Amino acid sequence: MERENLKSRLGFILLSAGCAIGIGNVWKFPYMAGQGGGGAFVLFYLIFLVLLGLPIMTMEFAVGRASKKSPVKAYQALEKPGQKWHIHGYFTLAGCYLLMMFYTTVAGWMLHYFYMTATGKLSGLSADAVADQFTRMLADPGVMMFWMVLVVVIGVVICAGGLQNGLERVTKVMMIALLAIMVVLAINSFFMAGAKEGLKFYLVPDFGRMQGVGVVSTLVGAMNQAFFTLSLGIGAMAIFGSYIGKDHSLMGESVRVVVLDTFVAITAGLIIFPACFTYGVDQTSGPSLIFITLPNIFANMPYGRLWGSLFFLFMAFAALSTVLAVFENIICCGMELTGASRRKSSLVNLFLIIALSVPCVLGYNVWSWDGFAVFGGAVLDFEDFLVSNLFLPLGSLVYLLFCVTRYGWGWENYKTEVNTGKGLKVHDWMRGYLTCGLPLIVIFIFLFGIYDKFFK
C-alpha cells in the first residue's frame, strides 16, 4: 500500500501543533504562571521547553520520517537485527488509546458548553446556578455519553476522509480559526477595567511570589508543564514525521511547533487574567476555571454570550485538534498492523474507542458510589495519571535512548536524519547533554510524578 503524504508544510506544522495544543494550555498553564511568579515562571518554562521538549520532539519526528511507518512499526524499520525496541511501538498505541479513553469525554464537555453558551442557556444565571449546571452535566450519563460519542464520530469521519482531503484540510481551517479567535478574545481582554492589574500579575516577574510558593516547587512545576505540554512519548508526533519529505530540517520544524504551542499557552493567560481581575474572581485551574469561573464572568460581561461562545468554540477546537491527531495515529497503526483500508480501520476504531471511553463517562455518575474508586479518584483521574505519569515520560525516555545511544538507532543516524533539509541543525556539542543529562531529567520527572501521586 503506497504511503500517503501531507500536501503542504503548513499542514504538517498545524497538525503537529494541534496535537500539542490542548486544554492544559488553558486550564493549567495560566494558573501555574500566576501562582509561580508571573514572568519568572514563564521565563523558566521557556528555558525548560528548549532544554526538554524541543530535543525529544525532534527525535519523534526523526523516527517517523526515517522509517516512513506508524509508531507501532517504526522501530522495526530502524533497529538492528535482534533488538527489541519495537516492543515500545505497541506501548505507544496503548498510550494513544488510553489518552482517548478520557480525552473524548473532556472534548465533549467543551462542545456541550459551546452549545449551552451559544443558545443562551447560561445567560442570567446566578453563580450557584452556573456551578450547578456543571454538576448536573456530570451526573447525567445520557448527556455525557451523547457528547462523547459525537466527538468520536466527528474525529473518525474526518480521519476516514483521507490524510489530505480529510485530516489536513479540516485541521488547517480549525487551527487558523483557533488562533484567530484567541487573538480576538485577547484584544477584548485588553480593554477590560482590570486588564492592567491582571497583565501585571501574569507577566511581570515577581520572585517574591515565587519564593512564597517555593522556588523548587515552582521550578519543578515549570519543568513538568514544559515536558507534558507537547504530548511526547506516545508517537503522536512521530506519525506526522512519517508523512513529510526531507526539504526542511526537523529542528527548525520542531521550533515552529513549539512556538505555536507556547503562543496559545501564553495568550490563554492574556484572556483569563484581565477578566478575573476585572470581575474580582479568584483565578483557579482545571475544570472549575473553565466550567464555573469563566461562565460566571461571561454571565456578567457585556456581550457575554458572544464572548463566551467564542471562548468555548476555541476550547472545542483545541480539544478536537488533539483528538484528530491521536485518532490518525491509531487508525494508521491499525492499517499497518492488519492491512486494512483507512475506512475499515476507522470504522473498527469508531466502535472500539466509544466502548473504551464509556468507563470515564460512567465514573462521574453510575459508577460514582463511595466504594468504587481507582487509587482514590475518578476513572478520568486514574487514566490521566497513567498517561501523564507513565506513558509520556517513559515513552519519551525510550525515544531518547533509541536515538542517541549505540544500543539503538544511534547518534549519527539520528543527527543525519534530523539535519537533512534547510533550517536549524543539531550539533555534536549537544551530544553529551542529550545522551547523559536529558535522560536523567526525564527520569527525575517520572519519579517525581510517582512521589507526588502516592507519597506526598
What is the role of each PLM region?
Residues 5, 11-13, 19, 145-146, ...:
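Loop-to-transmembrane helix boundary motifs in multi-pass membrane proteins
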Residues 2-6, 168, 172-320, 324, ...:
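Membrane-embedded translocation segments of transport machinery
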Residues 3-4, 32-36, 66-91, 104-164, ...:
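Inter-helical loop and helix-membrane interface segments of multi-pass membrane transporters/permeases
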Residues 1-27, 56-61, 65-78, 82-87, ...:
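Membrane-interface "cap" regions at the ends of multi-pass membrane proteins
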Residues 5-16, 41-44, 84-97, 145-151, ...:
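Select transmembrane alpha-helical segments in multipass membrane proteins
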Residues 88-93, 338-350, 382-442:
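C-terminal membrane-solvent junction of multi-pass transporters and transport-like membrane proteins
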Residues 11-48, 197, 235-241, 251-255, ...:
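Transmembrane helix-boundary motif of multi-pass solute transporters/channels
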Residues 3, 73, 107-139, 243-247, ...:
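Helix-loop-helix connectors at the membrane interface of multi-pass transporters/channels
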